[in-house]
């Protein structure tokens, strides 16, 4: 009988599959929101009036802040270490197309380059934008946006963790192989941007505020010593993002954009870390119109 119970327990542990929905402010929910914030499909500059049929090709590169060891304790409601410091940058390519009524349609794509164990997969963005007010010194534009796609990363069982003996400090989960975790960074939102035409024709400062509905999820797929852990975790929440930037027009076709964005994020941890959990990054963009 004792032997039967041992076999039954091991069989149960060999393939654990379940799903859970966590609060947006739980450590797991915060980690998903933080990663999603790094991929926000915000405007590279403010909505511009372009002619119907005009095409603009642009590329952007943004920073991803590094997290402390304490911030990476997000598993099991903030008790387990995860490897969240992956790629330090995020990039995308955009194509904008002029439509009638001063409207611009936009599609963006993140190339599937793997950096430090993280690889975007089928990460696409879509947006429509339009300037609504254009005065001599100030302008107002509105943009609606969305992103759909995944990022694969070895968060639960990283290469460094697997090198440590299972169930010892540094590998408390018992990882025996690199995990194949998949984070979905789906989101959609609305962005309003103000343009200030006060520094001449070449330099244009701008300010934008975005309201984003995030619907991230993660599938944990980790090989542990006593079985394969497969867990689906979901969360939902709304965030606000403040962006400040400046655009420099080299000429009518070439524009350089510099900006920074701040997304306040709250998290309830077993031990408070103060106000260090919000997302703040910097972005560099370049546009060429045909």
Where are these regions (language model features)?
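N-terminal signal peptide c-region/cleavage motif recognized by signal peptidases
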Residues: 13-17
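Outer-membrane beta-barrel "beta-signal"
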Residues: 277-290
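Transmembrane beta-strands of outer-membrane beta-barrel proteins
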Residues: 58-62, 106-110, 140-147, 206-210, ...
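Outer-membrane beta-barrel transmembrane domain signature
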Residues: 20-34, 63-74, 157-254, 262-268, ...
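Repeated loop/turn-to-beta-strand initiation elements of outer-membrane beta-barrel proteins
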Residues: 102-107, 135-140, 202-205, 252-258
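Transmembrane beta-barrel domains of Gram-negative outer membranes and organellar outer membranes
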Residues: 20-135, 147-149
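Membrane-embedded beta-strands of outer-membrane beta-barrel proteins
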Residues: 93-95, 126-128, 190-194, 242-244, ...
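Transmembrane beta-barrel outer-membrane domains
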Residues: 84-90, 117-123, 181-187, 233-239, ...
């Amino acid at each position: 009988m004792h032997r039967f119970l041992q076999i039954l327990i091991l069989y149960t542990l060999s393939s654990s599959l379940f799903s859970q929905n966590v609060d947006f402010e739980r450590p797991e929910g915060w980690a998903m929101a933080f990663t999603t914030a790094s991929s926000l499909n915000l405007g590279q500059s403010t909505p511009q009036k372009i002619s119907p049929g005009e095409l603009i090709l642009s590329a952007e590169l943004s920073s991803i802040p590094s997290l402390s060891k304490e911030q990476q304790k997000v598993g099991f409601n903030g008790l387990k270490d995860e490897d969240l410091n992956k790629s330090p940058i995020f990039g995308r390519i955009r194509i904008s197309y002029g439509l009638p009524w001063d409207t611009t349609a936009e599609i963006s794509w993140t190339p599937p380059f793997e950096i430090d164990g993280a690889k975007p997969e089928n990460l696409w963005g879509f947006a429509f934008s339009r300037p609504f007010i254009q005065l001599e010194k100030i302008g107002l534009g509105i943009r609606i946006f969305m992103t759909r796609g995944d990022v694969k990363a070895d968060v639960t069982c990283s290469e460094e963790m697997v090198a440590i003996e299972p169930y010892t400090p540094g590998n408390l989960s018992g990882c025996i192989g690199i995990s194949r975790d998949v984070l979905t960074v789906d989101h959609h939102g609305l962005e309003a941007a103000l343009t200030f035409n006060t520094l001449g024709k070449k330099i244009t400062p701008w300010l934008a505020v975005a309201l984003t509905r995030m619907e991230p999820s993660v599938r944990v797929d980790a090989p542990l010593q006593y079985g394969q852990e497969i867990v689906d975790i979901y969360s939902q929440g709304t965030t606000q993002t403040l962006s400040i930037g400046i655009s420099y027009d080299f000429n009518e076709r070439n524009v350089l954009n510099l900006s920074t964005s701040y997304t306040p994020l709250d998290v309830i941890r077993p031990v408070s870390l103060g106000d260090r959990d919000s997302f703040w990054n910097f972005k560099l963009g370049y546009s060429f119109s045909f």
